[in-house]
Amino acid sequence: MYSKEMTEVKSRCLGAFVGLAIGDALGAPVEFRRRGMFTPVTGMRAGGTFGLPSGAWTDDTAMALCLADSLLHNPEFDVVDLLERFCDWMLTGTNTSTGKSIGIGQNTLRTLGNYRRTGETTAIKGGKRSDGNGAIMRLAAVPCMHWQNVEKARSIAIAQSQCTHHSPLSEGCCDLMTFILCQLISGKIWEQILPYPNKNNWLEEVSLLSS
């Protein structure tokens, strides 16, 4: 690949990952608040449920950094390494913006606790309790690492979801988002990506997103 093309790819990867953190920091002060109950977000601000300083990120970016660190350690995906990093974040505040883990969801707390007790690396299927967006919020590093091998990226995206959010909806959304990000990183535009045929037996809700 020509150096100019690779520079553009690196820029898109940077945009995907840094954009994740910026969006997280922008939304943190109004997280859990209903639409219309706060002034429009036009810049970084402090406060919110967790009393964070302006520009601070939440558990979503912290876990994204854990996933990125794990993939740098083993690009093929090491589930034990990832879960150990998640536990380190939960217990010691690694990869947080304030030195203390905040915002951990009940589903993630439950599954990491189960891993520490039993060594089980796959979250218990919890129905709608496992349908949260935690797994998709953190996955940017997967397409950034494996955008040239879309099937591998999609497989890892599903596997990392199963660590904490083991449900067809969460896994399908991670699969679809990773496919989209891989295509965008490679230089394709929306019109070349969607609609995408449902080849993976996604739930109807996920299929609607891809149409």
Where are these regions (language model features)?
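Structured, active/binding-site neighborhoods that engage oxygen-rich ligands
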Residues: M1-S211
